[in-house]
């Protein structure tokens, strides 16, 4: 994190909090260009147990989604820590996913995304819905964000969107040649 902090400083990041030292978990916080408070804490320095590698009850986490007004501008802001574009979609709303040091960071112009949120893939819709009902979590079915089948409100207020599959799907190329023979009759 100390190395990233130096790079971020070189790129004009203005930290609200910065604590870097040899014998502590390095930590920093700042606000992004859309006003979201971001806090980064040094990664663990121990090996995780095999049990901890399993998916959560929500399924497999695949993205931290941030609502942005201008995806390209936000991408420029995040470039010092998220240099690799993983996937991009322009329609129906612009959405870019970057590798932010092994954290998939999504930047979305979707009006349905109100705050930073976590996205999960879960093929067991019935099982998950039974679990959230049993636990009494606050949910919204079909919340309108990228085809999620449910939005679960965590106790501290974070929204967890759950999808049957990754909404950006597999990469594909669009043929824009205009040649009608490209389309079967």
Regions picked out by a protein language model, each given a short descriptive name:
Residues 1-34, 68-73, 117-159, 163-165:
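Vicinal oxygen chelate
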Residues 19-20, 41-43, 64-67, 88-92, ...:
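Glycine-rich loops and low-complexity Gly/Arg-rich segments
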Residues 20-26, 58-59, 65-103, 134:
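Core segments of cupin and vicinal oxygen chelate
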Residues 17, 50-52, 85:
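Short helix-to-loop capping/linker segments positioned immediately adjacent to catalytic or ligand/cofactor-binding
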Residues 11, 53-55, 106-109:
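A short alpha-helix capping/helix-coil boundary motif
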Residues 41-76, 80-81, 113-118, 166-185:
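N-terminal beta-strand motif that seeds the catalytic metal site of vicinal oxygen chelate
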Residues 31, 37-45, 83-122, 144, ...:
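Conserved short beta-strand elements that form part of the metal-binding/catalytic scaffold
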Residues 25, 37, 47-49:
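Short, well-ordered, mixed-charge alpha-helical segments that flank or form enzyme active sites
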């Amino acid at each position: 994190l100390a190395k990233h902090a130096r790079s971020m400083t070189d790129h004009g990041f203005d930290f609200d909090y910065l604590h870097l030292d040899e014998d502590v978990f390095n930590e920093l916080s700042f606000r992004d260009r859309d006003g979201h408070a971001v806090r980064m804490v040094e990664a663990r320095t121990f090996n995780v147990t095999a049990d901890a590698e399993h998916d959560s009850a929500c399924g497999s986490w695949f993205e931290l989604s941030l609502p942005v007004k201008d995806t390209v501008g936000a991408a420029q802001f995040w470039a010092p820590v998220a240099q690799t574009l993983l996937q991009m979609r322009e329609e129906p709303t612009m959405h870019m996913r970057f590798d932010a040091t092994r954290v998939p960071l999504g930047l979305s112009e979707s009006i349905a995304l109100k705050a930073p949120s976590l996205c999960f893939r879960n093929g067991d819709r019935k099982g998950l819905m039974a679990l959230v009902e049993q636990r009494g979590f606050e949910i919204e079915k079909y919340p309108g964000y990228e085809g999620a089948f449910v939005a679960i409100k965590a106790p501290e207020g974070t929204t967890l969107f759950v999808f049957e599959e990754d909404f950006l799907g597999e990469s594909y190329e669009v043929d824009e040649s205009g040649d009608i023979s490209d389309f079967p009759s």
